[in-house]
């Protein structure tokens, strides 16, 4: 959600902070700000509503000197988007400037307590309460900043990632986290700080991921010091990250989202590299090899996820049940964690998250672990909280996803779920060798089939203009195509702001058919499958009510082509692999409609890439 950046060292902090905020724009935000310790030890704070570019204009001609600072992009949780509510927030005496990601649940109680002691507040945010609390504790006890932060955080209930600078101690930054990500970049006599590693790849590939309850003390030229709230040292070794600048640039595309749609063939190849042997048509997953006993004795799989990852989980359910004959439940993590679910020690919980930082999914993991379940994580970001909280798992290896609307992460998640189901099905003996090799062989061919679909982008761009002013959409699919329909509807909602709903095609008669008329576009995934004839009947019913049909069909299907207003043809593949190919035209359709409507495709309103608060 919010993005934090910090720097302390010998370089000028301002350009590093601004560049870092731009790297974090993909997380979503409504305002931005920065605090700089100037060369004359003045604490200068600049804020603006809008984009990072607006912050740059605000600071034009101002004193942006200094080699120490923190910065922030805010996504409003407490208080509307405004300059006053933007971070950094300052203490009563103006000595401290703090940036914060998360939610302080008991902020109202703390605020009342501070007001009774004479503190006054300028904003309506929980963050200002936190910095005022730290400042009050520091002033009352004449304490150093670290001790004041430790004492203040003991009173806090909620989630936080914070970075604090102190005018009286201009040679340090104090950073802390609980249930919200924070990464320290380690350079030569300098430190970088950010919500994820993307802002620091220009300067260092050595990072330390802070764990819950840890506080980092960053001083230029000094070793990194990490302690807990009780001042007990927490040893860490820096990890080497493999990000490169090219992965964080558009590469000639007008938007990151379009680039990431077109990246998918290569991403899926990367996801399979080292795991799929195309010569022997076999799959090797180290997580399955190393934890075979725990996975094979599972009486049930429970998939927990949110948003797009939940849709991937629905496909995973069908794959695992079909290949492994093990029952699978798919749960919204936000519902699962609060409904007192029945969890058995022989359950395997699969947690799916692109960022690896989704707050509700992390909470669901902790609940399942507390009841003895084995946890398998599927995420994209190496070293993320979910990757560290699970017993084992698989990275999707699709590279940084900058567009807020997920594309390549979705197909990466589906690919890993396919590999997991194949590996387990073979180990269990529930998938015949012939079928196993046939599916793997087809899976190897998927990237090239994706490229074939992408060649139709001009056609999809052309007819998407016909739906620029549509107010509603219905998406339909059956079997493996139903989650694809859900994901297609979500993509359209996210970036074009058109209301869209996905349904199983058979459920059309149970309500949605009442909405169909000449003004209602219907997107239907109708590739060849055992249910093809039934889906064909659905299309005929839609056309009988003058509905406009966009059909995703298998190459050579002339029957539906003659019925539909527009049809997008896909290369033939196995039904279980159709989602990998069929999702691409729906991503392109959503993208081009949003572009026609003049929307901010990469940073749609009110959305955050990484939902790190509940």
What are these model-predicted stretches?
Residues 183-208, 334-368, 507-543, 573-587, ...:
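Glycine-rich, anion-gripping cofactor-binding loops and their flanking helix/strand elements
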Residues 257, 548, 561-563, 573-614:
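Generic C-terminus detector
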Residues 293-445, 527-566, 570, 589:
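Glycine-rich phosphate-binding loops that contact phosphosugars or nucleotide phosphates
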Residues 68, 96, 300-302, 348, ...:
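Structural motif
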Residues 154, 264-268, 272-302, 392-521, ...:
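Active-site phosphate/pyrophosphate-binding segments
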Residues 1-250, 254-255, 266-300, 338, ...:
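Conserved short alpha-helical segments that host acidic/polar catalytic motifs at enzyme active sites
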Residues 67, 71-84, 279-292, 316-352, ...:
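Glycine-rich oxoanion-binding loops at beta->alpha junctions
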């Amino acid at each position: 959600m919010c993005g934090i950046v910090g720097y302390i060292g010998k370089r000028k902090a301002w350009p590093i902070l601004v560049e870092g905020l731009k790297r974090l724009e993909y997380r979503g935000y409504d305002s931005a700000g920065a605090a700089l310790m100037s060369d004359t030890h003045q604490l200068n704070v600049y804020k603006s509503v809008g984009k990072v570019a607006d912050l740059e204009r605000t600071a034009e001609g101002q004193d942006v000197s200094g080699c120490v600072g923190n910065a922030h992009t805010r996504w409003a949780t407490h208080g509307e988007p405004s300059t006053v509510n933007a971070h950094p927030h300052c203490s009563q005496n103006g000595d401290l400037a703090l940036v914060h990601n998360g939610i302080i649940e008991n902020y109202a109680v703390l605020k009342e307590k501070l007001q009774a002691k004479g503190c006054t507040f300028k904003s309506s945010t929980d963050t200002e309460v936190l910095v005022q609390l730290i400042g009050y504790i520091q002033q009352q006890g004449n304490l150093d900043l670290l001790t004041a932060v430790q004492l203040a955080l003991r009173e806090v209930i909620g989630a936080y990632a914070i970075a604090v600078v102190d005018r009286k101690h201009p040679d340090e930054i104090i950073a802390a986290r609980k249930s919200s990500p924070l990464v320290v970049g380690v350079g030569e006599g300098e430190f970088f700080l950010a919500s994820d590693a993307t802002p620091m790849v220009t300067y260092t590939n050595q990072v330390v991921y802070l764990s819950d309850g840890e506080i980092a003390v960053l001083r230029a030229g000094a070793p990194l010091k990490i302690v807990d709230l009780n001042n007990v040292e927490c040893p860490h070794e820096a990890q080497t990250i493999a990000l490169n600048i090219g992965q964080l640039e558009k590469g000639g595309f007008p938007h990151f989202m379009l680039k990431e749609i077109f990246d998918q063939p290569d991403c899926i190849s990367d996801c399979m590299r080292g795991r799929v042997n195309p010569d022997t048509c076999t799959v090797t997953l180290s997580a399955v090899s190393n934890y075979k006993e725990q996975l094979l004795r599972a009486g049930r799989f429970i998939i927990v996820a949110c948003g797009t990852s939940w849709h991937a989980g629905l496909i995973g359910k069908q794959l695992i049940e079909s290949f492994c004959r093990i029952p699978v439940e798919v749960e919204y993590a936000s519902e699962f964690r609060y409904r007192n679910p029945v969890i058995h020690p022989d359950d395997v919980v699969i947690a799916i998250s692109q960022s690896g930082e989704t707050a509700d999914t992390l909470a669901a993991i902790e609940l399942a672990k507390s009841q003895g379940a084995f946890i398998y994580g599927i995420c994209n970001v190496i070293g993320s909280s979910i990757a560290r909280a699970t017993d084992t798992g698989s990275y999707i290896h699709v590279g940084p996803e900058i567009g807020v609307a997920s594309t390549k992460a979705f197909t990466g998640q589906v690919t890993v779920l396919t590999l997991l189901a194949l590996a387990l099905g073979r180990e269990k003996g529930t998938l015949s060798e012939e079928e196993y090799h046939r599916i793997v062989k087809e899976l190897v061919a998927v990237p090239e089939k994706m490229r074939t679909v992408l060649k139709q982008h001009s056609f999809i761009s052309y007819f998407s203009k016909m739906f620029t002013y549509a107010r509603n959409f219905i998406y339909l699919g059956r079997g493996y195509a139903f989650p694809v329909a859900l994901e297609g509807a979500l993509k359209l909602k996210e970036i074009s702001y058109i209301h869209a709903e996905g349904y199983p095609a058979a459920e059309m008669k149970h309500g949605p058919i009442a909405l169909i008329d000449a003004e209602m576009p219907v997107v239907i995934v109708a590739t060849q499958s055992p249910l093809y004839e039934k889906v064909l009947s659905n299309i005929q019913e839609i056309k009988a009510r003058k509905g406009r049909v966009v059909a995703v069909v298998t190459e050579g299907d002339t029957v539906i082509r003659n019925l539909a207003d527009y049809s997008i043809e896909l290369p033939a593949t196995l039904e279980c692999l159709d989602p990998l190919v069929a999702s691409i035209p729906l991503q392109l359709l959503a993208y081009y409609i949003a572009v026609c409507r003049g929307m901010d495709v990469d940073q749609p309103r009110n959305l955050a890439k990484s939902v790190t608060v509940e």
